[in-house]
């Protein structure tokens, strides 16, 4: 009887640890969870268009990074600083298809801004913690993001 209880308790502990809250388990392997979204830093340089295409191929609903508040920006900053040497990553913000009408590739509303004026695509300059316009044909590392 004691052995049965021990095994049952062990299975219960294993089940509870695997079930968790459910949210983090919906992230793919090597992706990080934050506030209902999964994020992954890619240390491979691509043009903005190629990076966005790559993100959409990773998971349904995945796009280049969109940022909506300073806390989210700080989370991404901490994730990328350790991995990337140049500290510049593509973001989903652009006006490639609709000049002067800025929007995120994931369709989210532009509700947080931190940039200098320039060209059609945006990068997040990690070391300076601000956004900057960049030529879309230049190559940079990137972060993909999707909603859990």
Swiss-Prot record:
Signal peptide feature range: 1-23
Subunit structure and binding partners: Heterodimer; disulfide-linked.
Annotated compartments: Secreted
Record's protein name: Snaclec 5
Single annotated GO MF: toxin activity
Keywords (A to Z) from UniProt: Disulfide bond, Hemostasis impairing toxin, Secreted, Signal, Toxin
Recorded GO CC terms: extracellular region
Described purpose of this protein according to its UniProt entry: Interferes with one step of hemostasis (modulation of platelet aggregation, or coagulation cascade, for example).
